[in-house]
Amino acid sequence: MKLSEIIQHAKGTVLNPSIMIHDYEIIGGCGSDLMSDVLAVVKPGAVLLTGLCNPQVVRTAQMADIRAIIFLRGKQPSTEIVALATQENIPLISTDMGMFELCGRLYRAGLHSFETNWNGFHE
């Protein structure tokens, strides 16, 4: 799924529009506020949905090769976080939606979940 489609589903606002995002292909997603969980399940090319709004989110995305971060519930990262993400070429998006709603919308739209292998659970 293209990142531009995800932004439409999220009714999101791009916080660092200097990054060209329309051709970004996203292969799956993960929703979490625990960055250790993200590192345990996410695969390169994912989008991360989180309510956590600190530099560790960008550092986690950098380490895990996450393509984009969506901040939930109207969270707005500081200018330092936006600058760090822009430097790392990681698009930041903000939405007023909560995690449960946005995860459901994206999954229903066809975005693969990277959380389905927890504790032996499989689709």
For every predicted segment, state its role.
Residues K2-S4, G98:
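Short, structural beta-strand-to-alpha-helix junction motif
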Residues E5-G29:
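An N-cap/entry alpha-helix motif that binds or orients negatively charged groups
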Residues I21-I26, C30-V47, G51-E123:
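Feature captures the catalytic cores and cofactor-binding loops of soluble hydro-lyases/lyases
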